[in-house]
Regions:
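Metal-dependent amide/peptide-bond hydrolase catalytic core
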Residues: 1-110
Length: 110
């Protein structure tokens, strides 16, 4: 801002809760993901992320499971995380992702 002759103030709010998945819903989502993607398509352990996520507020009220849906192969289309200027959504995963989400809803509603 200063280089353009303006000023700015930054306030940092440390108010996001830790996002913690409930065990039962995580196992439910994992089982269906394994049906849809197979063992080779499901990563069970990733490094913890230091980011804020609004879904954490929802998980304070109801049990649930936040998961990531892969978007591409390393170095290929869709390999950047969202909120990155190099991000390019991989349209090829739309039907696969929709299949998983539909299966989650369908199975939950039985």
């Amino acid at each position: 801002a200063k280089s353009y002759g303006a000023s700015s103030e930054v306030e940092v709010f440390d108010s996001y809760p830790v996002l913690t998945n409930s065990v039962e819903e995580t196992e439910f989502a994992k089982a269906l993901a394994l049906e849809v993607f197979g063992e080779e398509g499901v990563l069970e352990s990733i490094s913890p992320m230091n980011a804020s996520e609004d879904f954490a507020f929802m998980l304070q009220q109801r049990p649930g499971c936040y998961f990531l849906l892969g978007n591409g192969e390393k170095g290929g289309k869709g390999s950047c995380m969202v909120h990155n200027p190099g991000y390019d959504f991989n349209d090829d995963i739309i039907s696969t992702g929709a299949t998983l989400f539909a299966r989650l809803v369908e199975t939950h509603c039985r």
